[in-house]
Amino acid sequence: MAKKIVGYIKLQVPAGKANPSPPIGPALGQRGLNIMEFCKAFNAQTQGVEPGLPIPVVITAYADKSFTFIMKTPPATILIKKAAGVQKGSPKPHTDKVGKLNRTQLEEIAKTKQPDLTAADMDAAVRTIAGSARSMGIEVEGV
């Protein structure tokens, strides 16, 4: 028989830097889950990822106090800002441009995000990422 699910916890945790302090500790503690077990498992799985890059994670809590977690890809906005070399998007995205991205940079971001996107093919994924970049005030070339 399958285990009974008590809830889902969605967090964004910096890669390789999970520790029992907030927001992780209180979120897992409320459900009675082993905080250190999650931190060790998460840090082990994110060893190959750039340290500090926020990784969205969905933790499934079960009635027997056990858990499983699924890691998603980093948010597109963070990958876009990193590729464009900017700290933050433009406060007036359609008038003030803060950076530039070309097609190859967009394709690289789309390849990273592909598992989490609903796009049918790579071209659709690139257009999705290009739209996100435009809404941040970053100029897009070649799309």
UniProtKB/Swiss-Prot annotation:
Modifications the protein undergoes after translation, according to the UniProt entry:
One or more lysine residues are methylated.
A Pfam family for this UniProt protein? Ribosomal_L11_N
Keywords from UniProt, A to Z, are: Methylation, Ribonucleoprotein, Ribosomal protein, RNA-binding, rRNA-binding
- Name a single GO cellular component: cytosolic large ribosomal subunit
Q: Which PANTHER family match?
A: 60S RIBOSOMAL PROTEIN L12, LARGE RIBOSOMAL SUBUNIT PROTEIN UL11M
The subunit structure is: Part of the ribosomal stalk of the 50S ribosomal subunit. Interacts with L10 and the large rRNA to form the base of the stalk. L10 forms an elongated spine to which L12 dimers bind in a sequential fashion forming a multimeric L10(L12)X complex.
The entry's protein name is Large ribosomal subunit protein uL11
Provide the gene name from the record: rplK
